């Protein structure tokens, strides 16, 4: 990632939270701690943020607090072939008539293309996913209510009793900030709250992550590994990551990017 892109992500992140730690910024930019500290120092000298102990803060915080994490437009360009292969493998699990939940994200957005030939009942909190499927498929679409967070292209409701409680699915598809021994990780408490509600509404949880996500870490844990039914990832997954999932009883499906379809295998 180029310096200009890293600086854009850092400045976006500090507008979203009172203080952003160096560790969080490393995860967002996929840069080393030393590089991240140099970026913070450079932006501090340019008076674009304020360097604080262990991280950075905004000089003029935004009145509307957004979500922590990389913007959708930046994530969309990263690991694109892997995401497309993962999405094809995920839709192979779906039959016509299935009820599914799709959590917003750039990997899950790739589901829209293979889903065009399906007829499923789909609940999503992603405006781009809903819009595309409405235009280009015969799936039945339900959209969650709430505020639209523009940079992540996701809709989150501040209310506990919303339409989410009225939809139950056979399977939920979602991405993540990171995946490790302690479980599935996310970048923002608001995402955690919304996604936990969705997870409760599905029998199976299918996590779509490219292999880089096994290296990412966050301080916020969404759910433990044993709540995950299946992980679909690309063929760069390490033996260590595959063994970690297998030990937790998680099925692993490896999608071959560039091959038109998946190669499957059980992690246990």
Question: Which ranges hold each PLM region?
Answer:
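Glycine-rich N-terminal segment of FAD-binding domains in flavoprotein oxidoreductases
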Residues: 104-106
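Conserved SAM-binding loop
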Residues: 101, 122, 187
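Catalytic core of membrane glycerolipid acyltransferases/transacylases, capturing the structured
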Residues: 113-115, 122-131
């Amino acid at each position: 990632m180029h310096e200009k892109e890293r600086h854009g992500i850092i400045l976006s992140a500090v507008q979203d939270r009172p203080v952003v730690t160096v560790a969080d910024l490393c995860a967002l930019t996929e840069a080393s701690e030393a590089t991240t500290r140099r970026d913070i120092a450079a932006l501090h000298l340019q008076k674009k943020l304020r360097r604080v102990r262990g991280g950075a803060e905004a000089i003029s915080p935004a009145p509307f607090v957004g979500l922590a994490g990389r913007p959708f437009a930046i994530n969309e360009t990263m690991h694109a072939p892997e995401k497309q292969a993962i999405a094809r493998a995920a839709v192979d699990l779906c039959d016509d008539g299935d009820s599914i939940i799709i959590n917003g994200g750039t990997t899950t957005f790739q589901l829209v293309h293979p889903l065009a030939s399906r007829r499923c009942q789909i609940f999503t909190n992603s405006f781009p996913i809903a819009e595309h499927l409405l235009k280009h498929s015969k799936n039945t679409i339900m959209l969650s209510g709430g505020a639209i967070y523009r940079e992540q292209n996701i809709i989150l409701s501040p209310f506990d009793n919303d339409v989410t409680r009225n939809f139950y699915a056979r399977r939920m598809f979602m991405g993540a900030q990171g995946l490790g021994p302690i479980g599935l990780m996310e970048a923002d408490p608001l995402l955690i709250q919304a996604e936990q509600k969705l997870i409760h509404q599905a029998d199976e949880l299918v996590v779509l992550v490219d292999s880089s996500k096994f290296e990412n870490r966050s301080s916020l844990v969404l759910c433990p590994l044993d709540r995950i039914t299946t992980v679909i990832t690309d063929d760069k997954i390490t033996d260590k990551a595959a063994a970690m999932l297998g030990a937790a009883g998680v099925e692993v499906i490896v999608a071959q990017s560039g091959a038109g379809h998946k190669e499957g295998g059980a992690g246990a």
